[in-house]
């Protein structure tokens, strides 16, 4: 209802796509501006899909999961470039929390940390938000 109201009031057509479990680029449609919120949630979904039994996680599988997530983000970027649009990726920063002891959380932290770094390195701009204050990193 809020989206409909906003579309009518502002003359801007936008919507929220939730529950993206694979092929996020395919969900973009013709939207020129995309906010990909919760890269961390998407990473968790990919981890669960590619390694349902965390005891089977290997360094090789971890790298494969990282490549899959990064490829999905790059596919989204390519689609946005085709539309001459912009994309914002929102994610969690894993380096400021207490080091986990749970094997799944350890793998998640390593994977998301690597993915975040790769995405940030290839982005035009990078911001960090703490206590509601944004800091431009790049």
Where are these regions (language model features)?
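Short, conserved beta-strand edge motifs with alternating hydrophobic and charged residues
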Residues: 17-18, 35-37, 89-90, 129
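Conserved P-loop
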Residues: 1-29
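A structural micro-motif
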Residues: 12-14, 32, 85, 124
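A basic- and aromatic-enriched beta-loop-alpha substructure that forms the phosphate/nucleotide-
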Residues: 21, 32-54
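Flexible, charged surface loops at secondary-structure boundaries
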Residues: 26-31, 81-83
């Amino acid at each position: 209802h809020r989206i409909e109201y906003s579309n009518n009031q502002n003359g801007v057509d936008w919507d929220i796509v939730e529950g993206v479990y694979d092929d996020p680029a395919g969900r973009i449609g013709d939207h020129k501006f995309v906010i990909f919120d919760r890269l961390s949630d998407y990473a968790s979904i990919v981890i669960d899909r590619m390694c349902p039994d965390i005891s089977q996680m290997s360094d090789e599988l971890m790298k494969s999961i990282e490549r899959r997530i990064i490829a999905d983000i790059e596919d989204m970027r390519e689609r946005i470039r085709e539309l001459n649009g912009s994309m914002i990726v929102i994610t969690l920063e894993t380096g400021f929390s207490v080091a986990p002891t749970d094997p799944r959380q350890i793998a998640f932290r390593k994977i998301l940390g690597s993915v975040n770094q790769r995405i940030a390195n290839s982005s035009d701009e990078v911001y960090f938000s703490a206590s509601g204050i944004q800091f431009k990193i790049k």
